Curated annotation (Swiss-Prot):
Family per similarity comment: Belongs to the TPP enzyme family. MenD subfamily.
Domain of life: Bacteria
Catalytic activity: isochorismate + 2-oxoglutarate + H(+) = 5-enolpyruvoyl-6-hydroxy-2-succinyl-cyclohex-3-ene-1-carboxylate + CO2
EC number: 2.2.1.9
Annotated source species: Shewanella halifaxensis (strain HAW-EB4)
One Pfam family of this chain: TPP_enzyme_C
GO-annotated biological processes: menaquinone biosynthetic process
Cofactor(s) listed in the protein's UniProt record: Mg(2+); Mn(2+); thiamine diphosphate
HAMAP family: MenD
Single GO term (MF): manganese ion binding
Name assigned to this protein: 2-succinyl-5-enolpyruvyl-6-hydroxy-3-cyclohexene-1-carboxylate synthase
Amino acid sequence: MQTEHTAELNLLWGTLILEELARLGVKHVCMAPGSRSTPLTLAAAKQSKLSQHIHFDERGLGFMALGLAKASQAPVAIITTSGTAVANLYPAIIEAWLTHVPLIVLSGDRPPELIDCGANQAIIQPAIFAQYAKQLNLPTPDLNIAPQALLSLLDDAVCNQSQPVHINCMYREPLYPNEPSVDFSRYLAPIAKWQQQTKPYSQFATMNSGQMPTSDALARFVHGKGVIVAATLAPEQQSEELIVLAQKLGWPIVTDAQSQLRQHGGAIGNIDQLLQQPKSKALLAQAEKVLVFGGRILSKRLISYLNDQDWKDYWQVLPQQQRLDPSNKPKQVWIAPAHQFAALAWPRSSQANWALNLVQFNDELETLYQQQIDHAEFGEAQAIRAIAKRQTNEQQLFIGNSLPIRLYDMFAPITTSSANVFTNRGASGIDGLLATACGVAIAGAKPTTLIIGDISALHDLNSLAIARTVTSPFVIVILNNDGGNIFNLLPVPNEQLRSDYYRLSHGLEFGFGAAMFGLAYNQVDSLSDFIESYEYAMTYSGPSVIEVTVAQNQASEQIAQISSWVKQS
């Protein structure tokens, strides 16, 4: 057991850990205050390669890290103290695991002799995230454990990981160094070369076999009537290449809200509504082949279509191997970047332009939305369409769960440009949406809009403290329909149950919440006021809140009315 210079050795190990993580591609570190994580915090504070983000609430901290990792396309480190501080990261870790976002949790912990004996703030932390994180348990720092062993352990745990890693770091007291300097040169001698370099201690490279379909396989697959489905695709997956592929094959491409193509004029974006239109359903029923890029499709109608259709060939393209098909259809899964797969030497389909009428049907729905949403009573769909029309490819749009993402999926306009779209649709929770959007805004450093419901905003109100650290334009649009009105769309047995146990009307407004955190705030109840407030906010350097006040049943009644028209068209 190491007893001499304990605090200094703790700090040395923390310094080695943070330095190696920086070399492994970590650019951001998110920290919550705490004593047991002091060796990590002090090391991070002096690590110039890492941007530091501090927040008092570990749940929000985890989601901020998630947003930072999404937008920066790089792993993000999170430092917490021991106890329930670690447990508060769990929702963000689950979301990151399901959506393949690399987060690295560094949790301070009590030493073994203080676990399970009634010691303060001590819980069993190893494997706290169960199957949702790769686990590395470090011993208490000890001069008998070589520094190269520590670095090798880190490299093996973190390198090339696309999902969360939990590194549990046990520290004995004292935690705060008192001596100005301790000579560890003999201890560090084996890694002297590493200290002089900038590369990780160990490096791992995977040789890709590059197995792709042959030209004969491509020719056989495109023989017949087919559909391309653009499901969830991250901005870096260059989904525009899928439009080029669709034009080359002569097949329609239908798009999910998370595909980066929902507003594209060359795509069939209104697929959710078209699948309840008799003439569109009849046309789509002729399809024999399907090529799906990504997974986690939002529209239940599109999911049902893929499940119910008797496909001759079902191909799915994913960036990494995983099961992303609830229908469990027999299929060929190709592991490849979407844009690379789309750029293969595809021949034109033998049934090119077989579904050309879908383009007309899609355009007709856009005309219907202009008439029945844009020029109708002010409401949530109208606000979302107004936001979507004002996006450019130099902006970011984070869409919250529950009703906002569904309204965007159903009613987004056809436009010539659109923002990079971000969501949390792994576990699809309403927690941490504001914090995640803050991370996206900070890492992206571009004008960013968050569309979020009132219950989701209340759930993550603490994260307005993170929002005030954003320096680029960051507009938080809260759609306040006074409760969880997504349940208006679900078959709850009666209205009293819906009101008492599901909707949970609260009668709250967000003005004082914004004021508490010093954020600019506007409350609007008309389209003209909303557009004026939103366009101004997008020129404002920093965060602002726009609260859109609407009637409880406005969105659900509008959805039902439009659905009725579509079914009869």
